[in-house]
C-alpha cells in the first residue's frame, strides 16, 4: 500500500485502526472450537439490549401510577412495541445464558490461569454488573412480582450491622418501596449497561494483551490466524443458531421465563403466595435460603463472587490448563456443573422437606469445589506422571 493510499485508508485512521487491530486482524489461535464463539456473542447480546432498551425508554414513564400502564401502552399501541419488549425481556435471559456458557467454557479450558488473571477478574466484575442490572431492570414493569421482589431483595441490606436500616431507607428513598425507588432503579438500569460496555472494553483489552487461550490450554505464539474472515464465518453458524433459539422464545413463548403475577399491577396490600426470582437469580437465592439466619444468608453471597475472583490464584496447574488433560479436575468440574444446575432447581422450590436439606448440601458442594481446586494441580506439579500412570484410560492409545 502506498503512502497516499494508506493516508486515505479508513482502517488506518486512529480510532478505526484500533478496531482493525482488535476486531479484524487480531491474531487468534488456529484451533479454536465453537465454544469460543460465546464471547463475541455476548457482545452482540449487549448491543441488542442497549438498542432495545433505549427505544423502550422513549415510551416508558417511571411513575408508580403510570409505569404499569406505560408498559401496556408499549405492548398495545406502539407499533412493534411488543417485539421490542419481548426482545429486551427475553434478551436478558439469552444474554445471561450466553455468559454462563462463556464462564463454564473458561473453567473447562483453564482460560483464567496465568497470565490471564485480569481477564478473569474483569469478567467477574462484568458478571456482577449484569446481575445488578438484571435485578433493577425487573422493577420498572411495576407488576406484583416487580414490587415484592424489590421489597424483599433490598430489605436484605438490613442484615448489615449498624448501618443496615439506613441503607435500606436510602435504597427505597423513603420508608417503603415507592415512586422514588422506581425512579432511581430506572435511572440506574439505563446507566449500568453503558458501564458494562466500558468494563467489556477493559475485558477485551486484557484478553488481547496476552492473546486468546486455546482448547489445548497451551501458549501458542506462532500458530495463529486473523480473526476476519475465518472466525467471523465460523461464529456465524453459532449466531444463526442463537437467533433461531431466541426467536422461539420471542415469538412463541415470550412469557415462559417470566412470572404471571407480574401482569397484575403492583399492590402493597396482598403478598404473592410464592415470591420467585428470575431463573438467573435462583442459584444465589438457593444459597441465601440455605442459612436460616438472615445475616448469615446475606454473608454467604459475598464469598460466591470472592471465590470466582480468586479462581486464577487457586489453580496450581501452571502449564497444563485444559480439563481434557486433567482427569481428576475433569471429574470435579462435572460435579461442580451438576451442583450449579441443582442450585438453580432448588432455588425455585418451596421451603419444605426434602428441598431444605438438599438446599443446604448444594451450597456446601459449591464452595467445596473452590476449596479443593488447588489439589489436582499441586499433585500434577509434584508428580507430572501421576495422571498418565493412574488414569491411562483418559488418553488415546498409540
Curated annotation (Swiss-Prot):
It is found in: Mitochondrion inner membrane. It comes from the Eukaryota. Binds 2 heme b groups non-covalently. Heme b b566 binds at residues 102, 203. It is a multi-pass membrane protein. Coiled coil: none annotated. One of its GO terms (biological process) is mitochondrial electron transport, ubiquinol to cytochrome c. GO terms for cellular component: mitochondrial inner membrane; respiratory chain complex III. A ubiquinone binds at residue 208. Keywords: Electron transport, Heme, Iron, Membrane, Metal-binding, Mitochondrion, Mitochondrion inner membrane, Respiratory chain, Transmembrane, Transmembrane helix, Transport, Ubiquinone. InterPro entries: Cyt_b/b6_C, Cyt_b/b6_C_sf, Cyt_b/b6_N, Cytb/b6-like_sf, Cytochrome_b, Cytochrome_b_C_euk/bac, Cytochrome_b_N_euk/bac, Di-haem_cyt_TM. Heme 1 (or BL or b562) is low-potential and absorbs at about 562 nm, and heme 2 (or BH or b566) is high-potential and absorbs at about 566 nm. Belongs to the cytochrome b family. The main subunits of complex b-c1 are: cytochrome b, cytochrome c1 and the Rieske protein. This is Cytochrome b.
Amino acid at each position: 500500500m502506498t503512502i497516499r493510499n494508506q493516508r486515505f485508508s479508513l482502517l488506518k485512521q486512529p480510532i478505526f485502526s484500533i478496531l482493525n487491530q482488535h476486531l479484524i486482524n487480531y491474531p487468534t489461535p488456529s484451533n479454536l472450537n465453537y465454544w469460543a464463539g460465546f464471547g463475541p456473542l455476548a457482545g452482540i447480546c449487549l448491543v441488542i439490549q442497549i438498542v432495545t432498551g433505549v427505544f423502550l425508554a422513549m415510551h416508558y414513564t417511571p411513575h408508580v401510577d403510570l409505569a404499569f400502564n406505560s408498559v401496556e401502552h408499549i405492548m398495545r399501541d406502539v407499533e412493534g412495541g411488543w417485539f421490542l419488549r419481548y426482545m429486551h425481556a427475553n434478551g436478558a435471559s439469552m444474554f445471561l445464558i450466553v455468559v454462563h456458557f462463556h464462564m463454564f467454557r473458561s473453567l473447562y479450558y483453564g482460560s483464567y490461569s496465568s497470565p490471564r488473571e485480569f481477564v478473569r477478574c474483569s469478567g467477574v466484575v462484568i458478571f456482577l454488573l449484569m446481575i445488578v442490572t438484571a435485578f433493577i431492570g425487573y422493577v420498572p414493569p411495576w407488576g406484583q412480582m416487580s414490587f415484592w421482589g424489590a421489597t424483599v431483595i433490598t430489605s436484605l441490606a438490613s442484615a448489615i450491622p449498624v448501618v443496615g436500616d439506613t441503607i435500606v431507607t436510602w435504597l427505597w428513598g423513603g420508608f417503603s418501596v415507592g415512586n422514588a425507588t422506581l425512579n432511581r432503579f430506572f435511572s440506574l438500569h439505563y446507566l449500568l449497561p453503558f458501564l458494562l460496555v466500558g468494563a467489556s472494553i477493559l475485558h477485551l483489552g486484557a484478553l488481547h494483551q496476552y492473546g486468546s487461550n486455546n482448547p489445548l490450554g497451551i501458549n501458542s505464539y506462532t500458530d495463529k490466524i486473523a480473526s476476519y474472515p475465518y472466525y467471523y464465518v465460523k461464529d456465524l453458524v453459532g449466531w444463526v443458531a442463537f437467533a433461531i433459539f431466541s426467536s422461539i422464545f420471542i415469538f412463541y413463548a415470550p412469557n415462559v421465563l417470566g412470572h404471571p403475577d407480574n401482569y397484575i399491577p403492583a399492590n402493597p396490600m396482598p403478598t404473592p403466595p410464592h415470591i420467585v426470582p428470575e431463573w438467573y437469580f435462583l442459584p444465589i437465592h438457593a444459597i441465601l435460603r440455605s442459612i436460616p439466619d438472615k445475616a448469615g444468608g446475606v454473608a454467604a453471597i459475598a464469598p460466591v463472587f470472592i471465590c470466582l475472583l480468586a479462581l486464577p490464584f487457586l489453580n496450581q496447574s501452571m502449564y497444563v490448563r485444559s480439563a481434557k488433560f486433567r482427569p481428576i479436575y475433569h471429574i470435579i468440574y462435572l460435579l461442580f456443573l451438576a451442583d450449579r444446575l441443582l442450585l438453580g432447581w432448588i432455588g425455585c422450590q418451596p421451603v419444605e422437606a426434602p428441598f431444605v436439606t438438599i438446599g443446604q448440601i448444594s451450597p456446601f458442594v459449591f464452595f467445596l469445589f473452590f476449596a479443593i481446586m488447588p489439589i489436582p494441580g499441586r499433585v500434577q506439579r509434584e508428580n507430572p506422571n501421576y495422571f498418565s500412570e493412574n488414569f491411562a484410560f483418559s488418553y488415546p492409545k498409540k
